[in-house]
Amino acid sequence: MRSNILKLLQRTSRRYVSSKDFEPVIGSNPKKQTSRLMVGSVGVMIPVLLYLFYKNDSKHSEIKKIYQNEKKI
């Protein structure tokens, strides 16, 4: 991080400072950013879908009923 700032200052000291010099380096490539968003959304959706399928599964509801009946006794 510090070396990036030093390089930036060395680069900008020779000429007029423009707003492009202070743009973030990470995420500047739109294709990379889109692929990261896709991977992130898939990484979040898979566990959520697995949880929903498990929760709505008939075996899970039977186990839940048995557990609730035992809890009442």
From Swiss-Prot:
This is Uncharacterized protein YKL065W-A. Keywords: Endoplasmic reticulum, Membrane, Transmembrane, Transmembrane helix. The chain crosses the membrane at residues 37-54. It is a single-pass membrane protein. It is found in: Endoplasmic reticulum; Membrane. GO terms for cellular component: endoplasmic reticulum; membrane. The keyword Endoplasmic reticulum applies.
